UniProtKB/Swiss-Prot annotation:
It catalyses: RNA(n) + a ribonucleoside 5'-triphosphate = RNA(n+1) + diphosphate. Belongs to the influenza viruses polymerase PB1 family. Residues 55-64 have a biased composition (Polar residues). Residues 50-82 are annotated as: Disordered. Keywords: Eukaryotic host gene expression shutoff by virus, Eukaryotic host transcription shutoff by virus, Host cytoplasm, Host gene expression shutoff by virus, Host nucleus, Host-virus interaction, Inhibition of host RNA polymerase II by virus, Nucleotide-binding, Nucleotidyltransferase, Phosphoprotein, RNA-directed RNA polymerase, Transferase, Viral RNA replication, Viral transcription. It comes from Influenza A virus (strain A/Japan/305/1957 H2N2). It is found in: Host nucleus; Host cytoplasm. The lineage of its organism: Viruses, Riboviria, Orthornavirae, Negarnaviricota, Polyploviricotina. One of its GO terms (biological process) is viral RNA genome replication. This is RNA-directed RNA polymerase catalytic subunit.
Length: 757
C-alpha cells in the first residue's frame, strides 16, 4: 500500500517536524596531517582585520606587534577589529547602571575563589602545551613538569598548594635571567641479546639539562600551541584551535571566574548555564519583549551571526574592561586579573609540526619543521602556501609567530559574552531615546536580537544602530549570515524557538548506541541516554521503549551476548549456554552474561546490577562483585562516572552515569609500545600522580570537604583526616578497639617515615 508521506504530519504541529530534517548521519570529518597551514590562515586573517593599527616591537622578545585599538572608524561593512576604548568603557558603565552593584559583588565572589583555589585546578583539561618539552601533554603532567622546573630554579611559593602562590612563581620566573629545564631524549644502541644471541636495538631514555635565557623562556611562556579542530560538521575547511601553556592558564581561570560570576547575574547571557536552565532563561527574555510591546508595535528577531568573533576581539579591550570592572578593588586583585589580557597581548602562536614534502619519483618524504619556514626557499611551495609564508615571515621567531591582536578560540568565552551583553543592554528606551528598542541573548559569539518598533522604518533604523554600536567595540555582525523574522521564530545556540523552544531530538541521535568502553559502562550509558532524552528532548514513551529494544539488540550484537536460550551461534555462545543451564534464577543473569533484559522505561534510572541483585544466584553474586577476581584489572570504584557523548552538533557533552563496579568493568591494558619510548618516564609520573590524587579523593570525598585552605601537605591532611574518622567510627561503635589501635599505629608510622625522610 502506498502511503502519502504528508499524512504522517497531519496531527503534528509544524515545529515538531524539525527532527525529520536531520542531516548528520555518518561520521564527522577529522583532520589529518599538519595544522600549520590553518594556523597561518588564522594569523594572517587576524592581522588583516587590524591592518590599519600601529606597529610596535616588544622590548623583551623582539616580536613585532600590531595594535588596532582606537584605530580608524570603519567606513564600509568589512569586518574589522578597531575597538574604541572609550566606547567599551561607556558600555561597561551603562551595564553597571542597569545592574547596580553587579561588578562589586562579582569581584568579592572572585576574591573568595582566588583565596581558596588549589593548584590542582589546573590538572583539569586535556591536552596542554608543555613549555618544558615544547609539545602537548596531558594537563596533569604539564603542571607537574612546570612545578618541578620552578622548584629546581628556586621558585618555591607553589609549595603551599594554592593556585595564587603558583602564579606568584610564574611572575617571578619572568624576571629571571635564565631558567634551567630538563628535556627527555632517546639513545639507540645495538647490543647482543643473551638468550637468542641476535643483535637487537636497545633504547634508553636520557635526560639532559638545558638553559633557557630570558628571551627564550618568555617566548615559551607566552606561547599557545595550535592544533586542528576535529569533528566539525558543515564546514568545508578545517580551522585551528589553540592550547595555552601552564603560565597563562591560571590567570585565564581567574578572569573567567570573574566573568562567569557577572554572566550569572545577567538575564541576557546564555552562559554559564546550559540545557533546560538555559532554555528557561531565554524564553524569559522573549516573553518580556512580547509583553512589553504595545499592540500596535512590530516585533522582529534577528538570528545573528558574527564574522570571525575571536579574530576581531582584542586582549587590550579586555584589559580595559577588567580595569573598569575592578576599579574600586584592592591593588593585588586588579594586578592578578590584568595579567591574562597582558599576556594575550604579547602572545605567540606555535606553528605546529610544519609541512610534509614527498617526491613521487624518488619515493622520499621529508618534514619541514616550522622553525625552517623563515629561511627555506619558497620555490618548493605551491602559490597559496607561498603567499601565506611571505605574509607571515616578518612575524616569525623560532618557529612561533607573534600574534598580538585577536583572541584564539575558546579562551575568554565568558568575558566576551559580557561585552556582547553590554551592547544588548544599550537597547533600552532610556538609552536609544527614540521609538525603537531592543533586547536579546548572547552566548560567546552567538546572539539573537529582539527588536521592537512602531513600524518597519523603525525596525530598520534599530538594526542599523545596533550594527554600528557593535562595530565600535570590535563586534562585526554579518549582514549576509544573519536573518530577520517576526518574533516567535528564531535559532540561538542550536536551540530552535517557535512559540517556545522546540525539542530537536534528532540532534541527540549520534549518542544513542553502544559506546564501546566495557560491558558495564556501555549498558549504563545506553539507558542513561534514553532516560535523559525522555526528560529533556520530548522523547515519547513509545519511541523510548523502541529505542531501548534497539539498544539491547545492538548491545547483544556488540558483545556477542545473546540470551542463553537463543539459536544464534557466536564465539561466546558455548560458554553463555553453559552458564544459562547451570543458573537456577535465569532472570538474575546480566544481559552481558546472556541474561534477559529487565529494563523498561520505568526503571532506566537503576543500574542493571541493582535491578537484578535480588534475582541472582548467590554464587553468581559472589563471582560478579568480587574485587579479588584475578581476571579483572579494576577501575577505581566510583559511584558516578562521566561519559563523553557526541551530539550531532556542538561540543561533546559530558554525561554522568551510575557506575557499579563488577567483573564487567574491565579496562583494556595499555599498549606496550609506549613503554619503550621517551614517553615512558612521563607515563610513570602520570600514573603516580593519578594514584596520589585518587587516594586523596578517597580521604576527602568531594561531598564532604571544602579543600583545605591551610598550608599542609597531602599526606598530613590525609593522616589527620584518618585519625578524626577513626575516632568517630570507634566512638559510634562502627569499628572495634583493635582496629582503632591499628589505624592509630599506621598513622604514627607514616609520620615517623616522613620525619626520617
Amino acid at each position: 500500500m502506498d502511503v502519502n508521506p504528508t499524512l504522517l504530519f497531519l496531527k503534528v504541529p509544524a515545529q515538531n517536524a524539525i527532527s525529520t530534517t536531520f542531516p548528520y548521519t555518518g561520521d564527522p570529518p577529522y583532520s589529518h596531517g599538519t595544522g600549520t597551514g590553518y594556523t597561518m590562515d588564522t594569523v594572517n586573517r587576524t592581522h588583516q582585520y587590524s591592518e590599519k593599527g600601529k606597529w610596535t616591537t616588544n622590548t623583551e622578545t623582539g616580536a613585532p606587534q600590531l595594535n588596532p585599538i582606537d584605530g580608524p572608524l570603519p567606513e564600509d561593512n568589512e569586518p574589522s577589529g578597531y575597538a574604541q576604548t572609550d566606547c567599551v568603557l561607556e558600555a561597561m558603565a551603562f551595564l553597571e547602571e542597569s545592574h547596580p552593584g553587579i561588578f562589586e559583588n562579582s569581584c568579592l565572589e572572585t576574591m573568595e575563589v582566588i583565596q581558596q583555589t588549589r593548584v590542582d585546578k589546573l590538572t583539569q583539561g586535556r591536552q596542554t602545551y608543555d613549555w618544558t618539552l615544547n609539545r602537548n601533554q596531558p594537563a596533569a603532567t604539564a603542571l607537574a613538569n612546570t612545578i618541578e622546573v620552578f622548584r629546581s630554579n628556586g621558585l618555591t611559593a607553589n609549595e603551599s598548594g594554592r593556585l595564587i602562590d603558583f602564579l606568584k612563581d610564574v611572575i617571578e620566573s619572568m624576571d629571571k635571567e635564565e631558567m634551567e629545564i630538563t628535556t627527555h631524549f632517546q639513545r639507540k644502541r645495538r647490543v647482543r641479546d643473551n638468550m637468542t644471541k641476535k643483535m637487537v636495538t636497545q633504547r634508553t631514555i636520557g635526560k639532559k639539562k638545558q638553559r633557557l635565557n630570558k628571551r627564550s623562556y618568555l617566548i615559551r611562556a607566552l606561547t599557545l600551541n595550535t592544533m586542528t579542530k576535529d569533528a566539525e560538521r558543515g564546514k568545508l575547511k578545517r580551522r585551528a584551535i589553540a592550547t595555552p601553556g601552564m603560565q597563562i592558564r591560571g590567570f585565564v581561570y581567574f578572569v573567567e571566574t570573574l566573568a562567569r560570576s557577572i554572566c550569572e547575574k545577567l538575564e541576557q547571557s546564555g552562559l554559564p548555564v546550559g540545557g533546560n536552565e538555559k532554555k528557561a532563561k531565554l524564553a524569559n527574555v522573549v516573553r518580556k519583549m512580547m509583553t512589553n510591546s504595545q499592540d500596535t508595535e512590530l516585533s522582529f528577531t534577528i538570528t545573528g551571526d558574527n564574522t570571525k568573533w575571536n579574530e576581531n576581539q582584542n586582549p587590550r579591550m579586555f584589559l580595559a574592561m577588567i580595569t573598569y570592572i575592578t576599579r574600586n578593588q584592592p591593588e593585588w586583585f586588579r594586578n592578578v586579573l590584568s595579567i591574562a589580557p597582558i599576556m594575550f597581548s604579547n602572545k605567540m602562536a606555535r606553528l605546529g609540526k610544519g609541512y610534509m614534502f614527498e617526491s613521487k619519483s624518488m619515493k622520499l618524504r621529508t618534514q619541514i619543521p616550522a622553525e625552517m619556514l623563515a629561511s627555506i626557499d619558497l620555490k618548493y611551495f605551491n602559490e597559496s602556501t607561498r603567499k601565506k609564508i611571505e605574509k607571515i615571515r616578518p612575524l616569525l621567531i623560532d618557529g612561533t609567530v607573534s600574534l598580538s591582536p585577536g583572541m584564539m578560540m575558546g579562551m575568554f568565552n565568558m568575558l566576551s559574552t559580557v561585552l556582547g551583553v553590554s551592547i544588548l543592554n544599550l537597547g533600552q528606551k532610556k538609552y536609544t531615546k527614540t521609538t525603537y528598542w531592543w533586547d536579546g541573548l548572547q552566548s560567546s559569539d552567538d546572539f539573537a536580537l529582539i527588536l521592537n518598533a512602531p513600524n518597519h522604518e523603525g525596525i530598520q533604523a534599530g538594526v542599523d544602530r545596533f550594527y554600528r554600536t557593535c562595530k565600535l567595540v570590535g563586534i562585526n555582525m554579518s549582514k549576509k549570515k544573519s536573518y530577520i523574522n517576526r518574533t516567535g521564530t528564531f535559532e540561538f545556540t542550536s536551540f530552535f524557538y517557535r512559540y517556545g523552544f522546540v525539542a530537536n531530538f534528532s540532534m541527540e541521535l549520534p549518542s544513542f548506541g553502544v559506546s564501546g568502553i566495557n560491558e558495564s559502562a556501555d549498558m549504563s550509558i545506553g539507558v542513561t541516554v534514553i532516560k535523559n532524552n525522555m526528560i529533556n528532548n520530548d522523547l515519547g514513551p513509545a519511541t523510548a521503549q523502541m529505542a531501548l529494544q534497539l539498544f539491547i539488540k545492538d548491545y547483544r550484537y556488540t558483545y556477542r551476548c545473546h540470551r542463553g536460550d537463543t539459536q544464534i551461534q557466536t564465539r561466546r555462545s558455548f560458554e553463555l549456554k553453559k552458564l544459562w543451564e547451570q543458573t537456577r534464577s535465569k532472570a538474575g543473569l546480566l544481559v552481558s552474561d546472556g541474561g534477559p533484559n529487565l529494563y523498561n522505561i520505568r526503571n532506566l534510572h537503576i543500574p542493571e546490577v541493582c535491578l537484578k541483585w535480588e534475582l541472582m544466584d548467590e554464587d553468581y553474586q559472589g563471582r560478579l562483585c568480587n574485587p579479588l577476581n584475578p581476571f579483572v584489572s579494576h577501575k577505581e570504584i566510583e559511584s558516578v562516572n562521566n561519559a563523553v557523548v557526541m551530539p550531532a552538533h556542538g561540543p561533546a557533552k559530558s554525561m554522568e552515569y551510575d557506575a557499579v563496579a563488577t567483573t564487567h568493568s574491565w579496562i583494556p591494558k595499555r599498549n606496550r609500545s609506549i613503554l619503550n619510548t621517551s614517553q615512558r618516564g612521563i607515563l610513570e609520573d602520570e600514573q603516580m600522580y593519578q594514584k596520589c590524587c585518587n587516594l586523596f579523593e578517597k580521604f576527602f570525598p568531594s561531598s564532604s570537604y571544602r579543600r583545605p585552605v591551610g598550608i599542609s601537605s597531602m599526606v598530613e591532611a590525609m593522616v589527620s583526616r584518618a585519625r578524626i574518622d577513626a575516632r568517630i567510627d570507634f566512638e559510634s561503635g562502627r569499628i572495634k578497639k583493635e582496629e582503632f589501635a591499628e589505624i592509630m599505629k599506621i598513622c604514627s608510622t607514616i609520620e615517623e617515615l616522613r620525619r626520617q625522610k
